[in-house]
């Protein structure tokens, strides 16, 4: 399960905590989940899908968005920069970038270098900002000093 700090960092970047946010591509609510993805996640959770609740019920949006992000985190063996990138650009893009640039989880490339090579400026910036915000929330919520060793693995 993603940490509270990670979820807050995603929400901050996705919607700036605006529960009624709507993107130009149709993503909705706090976690800016796409309706098609939300429908699939609701089915997996055995809960009712409601497009209107994506923007009117923050807990519903967070429940679906968290489940989806957790599935990405599992797909990438807890390597959250991959899951963050996949949440923004889609899972297939991450797989192609790992194939093209190497896998930082296998020490084929440094994580920072891999992030810098992300082809889409929006996704590269997104991953960088979410990672920055994780550290802000770790300190804000827990007064926990930031540790670099093992940081990129949940």
Show where each model-derived region lies:
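Catalytic glycan-binding domains that act on GlcNAc-containing polysaccharides
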Residues: 1-154
């Amino acid at each position: 399960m993603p940490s509270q700090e990670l979820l807050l960092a995603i929400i901050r970047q996705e919607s700036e905590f605006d529960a009624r946010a709507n993107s130009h591509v149709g993503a909705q609510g706090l976690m800016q989940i796409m309706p098609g993805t939300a429908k699939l996640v609701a089915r997996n959770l055995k809960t009712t899908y409601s497009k209107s609740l994506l923007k009117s019920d923050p807990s519903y949006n967070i429940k679906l968005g968290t489940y989806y992000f957790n599935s990405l985190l599992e797909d990438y063996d807890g390597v959250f920069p991959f899951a963050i990138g996949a949440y923004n650009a889609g899972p297939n893009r991450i797989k192609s970038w790992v194939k093209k640039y190497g896998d930082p989880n296998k020490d084929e490339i440094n994580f920072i270098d891999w992030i810098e090579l992300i082809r889409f400026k929006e996704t590269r910036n997104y991953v960088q900002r979410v990672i920055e915000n994780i550290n802000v929330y770790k300190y804000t919520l827990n007064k926990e000093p930031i540790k670099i060793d093992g940081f990129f693995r949940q």
